[in-house]
Amino acid sequence: MFVDQVKIYVKGGDGGNGMVAFRREKYVPKGGPAGGDGGKGGDVVFVVDEGLRTLMDFRYQRHFKAPRGEHGMSKNQHGKNAEDLIVKVPPGTVVIDDETKEVIADLTEHGQRFVVAKGGRGGRGNTRFATASNPAPEIAENGEPGQERYVTLELKLLADVGLVGFPSVGKSTLLSVVSAAKPKIADYHFTTIVPNLGVVETEDGRSFVMADLPGLIEGAHQGVGLGHQFLRHIERTRVIVHVIDMAAIEGRDPYEDYVVINEELKQYNLRLTERPQIIVANKMDMPNAEEHLQQFKQKLNEDVPIFPISAVTRQGIRELLFAIADLLETTPEFPLYPQEEEAIHRVVYKLEKEEAPFHITRDDDGTFILSGEKIEKLFKMTDFSREESVRRFARQLRSLGVDDALRARGAKDGDIVKLLNYEFEFVD
């Protein structure tokens, strides 16, 4: 069964670190700062590729991390921006944020792009921090961390071709012969409970996805048997291959089978009958099959191409696959229900509260815990190996109101404050 839902991890590249450097060339007195900025980290970008049909590739790789930007260099040389990480997805992929459960992208058109995780900006070099009062700063920023998240990919497209017919007419056998699919095969009804899918390739290199759908019986549109499950899957196919047991092994009239199945498709959704249909007369290697085929053609009384085959002996399979591939090339996709004449476009606006720059909680041992996206980003972009950077970080905390908030929570001189995996001593 093809994968149609998968959870993956994506992370944009971190920005490159800024550089602390000074000009030291001969004959350049008081050269001043010369540290370049870091380069931007790469984005993780989903790009729709119409050549892909499934999410199978994501079963083997579920972590995608874009490269980080190059670090800044001396002589005011900026680091190189990192290249984006391109991840190809099939048309019809829906991207859902795993934390909020919101749909963040619906990717349908070939070449459509969506940045799922943005890369961080490069850290500023010490040239950026030069002021009249501090013309030679020993301070630079680390690169901004890239965005990271878990997302769920869902693929609603099932197949190009759907095999329909009464139970045990040979649909599963046909699929197993023309593709690498391994459906459950037996001569009792409803062996196929869920759709089996297989990729079919013709001798001239064309390929398509074929679905062996659960068996259909009279009354399916009312939920009898496996009706609704079957019909929901066939809604998505572009070409219907109607398989008929021409040997009449079950004792039913092949023409009656044909009429009943088409009536069920018509009852469920009018648009199903608009799809092109190929009639396949299966089990032609069995006794009386040829006689039944002639009777079927007389009753049908239409100039409709019928492909006599035997899934077991592979008689007629090659011609059938070529006909399906030819039909797919000229068949567009079908909307599930009739289109409204005038589409109404709605835009949803949401009021999003501005997130607080930090939160303070307290552990059982009395340690104060600082958290929050903004304060954690400031921390990660601070170079703690340089005293000026540490002093700047302390000023940033004060300007955000962290010191006052800690005092209000009862923090005293010498108390431990924890941010991420690092501990500091509170100095009042």
UniProtKB/Swiss-Prot annotation:
Quick one: which residues bind GTP?
165-172, 190-194, 212-215, 282-285, 310-312
Q: Name one GO biological process term.
A: ribosome biogenesis
- The first-level EC class reads hydrolase
Enzyme Commission designation? 3.6.5.-
Q: Which InterPro entries match?
A: G_OBG, GTP-bd, GTP-bd_Obg/CgtA, GTP-bd_prot_GTP1/OBG_C_sf, GTP1-OBG_CS, GTP1_OBG_dom, GTP1_OBG_dom_sf, OBG_GTPase
Q: Name one Pfam family in it.
A: GTP1_OBG
The protein's UniProt keywords, in alphabetical order, are: Cytoplasm, GTP-binding, Hydrolase, Magnesium, Metal-binding, Nucleotide-binding
Matching PROSITE patterns: G_OBG, GTP1_OBG, OBG, OCT
Q: Which segment of the chain is annotated as a signal peptide?
A: none
Q: What Gene Ontology molecular-function terms does this entry list?
A: GTP binding; GTPase activity; magnesium ion binding
> Which ranges carry the OBG-type G domain?
159-329
Q: What are the names of the required cofactors?
A: Mg(2+)
**Residues the entry annotates as binding Mg(2+):** 172, 192
Please state the protein's primary subcellular location: cytoplasm
The record places domain Obg at 1-158
- Functional description taken from the UniProt entry: An essential GTPase which binds GTP, GDP and possibly (p)ppGpp with moderate affinity, with high nucleotide exchange rates and a fairly low GTP hydrolysis rate. Plays a role in control of the cell cycle, stress response, ribosome biogenesis and in those bacteria that undergo differentiation, in morphogenesis control.
Q: How does it assemble?
A: Monomer.
Q: What family, per the record?
A: Belongs to the TRAFAC class OBG-HflX-like GTPase superfamily. OBG GTPase family.
Q: In its UniProt entry, what is this protein called?
A: GTPase Obg
Task: Give the originating organism.
Answer: Anoxybacillus flavithermus (strain DSM 21510 / WK1)
